[in-house]
Amino acid sequence: MANTILKSTTRHIRIFTARVENNDLIADTSQLTLDIDPDNEFLWEQSTIEKIQSRFKELVECHTGADLTDYTLRRIGTELEGTLFSLLQAGELSYNPNARVLNYSMGLPRTTELS
């Protein structure tokens, strides 16, 4: 069980109990690795990435001292997915028109005419 990687996978957020070495995930229960938008569905500004990372750090700190379980990781992943949705709704994040598939997984894009 020592080499098992715990993970949380949502549509746009992946969290692993691992570190990255040579593009491989290596099990490491002392470290969490965050993968944001692995399918490149959105266009990201550095400030928006930093907001997600900051929220991730807050959520991890809230769970300090608790057992690290699949459930805990899923809660953190779900919260981050909600943060991503809020950023999209606020116009701080937009869909990538060059994405492999335009499925608008978090709702249709907002335009000033419809807002």
From Swiss-Prot:
It is a peripheral membrane protein. InterPro entries: NdhM. GO terms for cellular component: organellar chromatophore thylakoid membrane; plastid. Keywords: Membrane, NAD, NADP, Organellar chromatophore, Plastid, Plastoquinone, Quinone, Thylakoid, Translocase. It is found in: Plastid, Organellar chromatophore thylakoid membrane. It is an enzyme of class 7 (translocase). One of its GO terms (molecular function) is quinone binding. It comes from the Eukaryota. It catalyses: a plastoquinone + NADH + (n+1) H(+)(in) = a plastoquinol + NAD(+) + n H(+)(out); a plastoquinone + NADPH + (n+1) H(+)(in) = a plastoquinol + NADP(+) + n H(+)(out). Belongs to the complex I NdhM subunit family. NDH-1 can be composed of about 15 different subunits; different subcomplexes with different compositions have been identified which probably have different functions. NDH-1 shuttles electrons from an unknown electron donor, via FMN and iron-sulfur (Fe-S) centers, to quinones in the respiratory and/or the photosynthetic chain. The immediate electron acceptor for the enzyme in this species is believed to be plastoquinone. Couples the redox reaction to proton translocation, and thus conserves the redox energy in a proton gradient. This is NAD(P)H-quinone oxidoreductase subunit M, organellar chromatophore. The gene is ndhM.
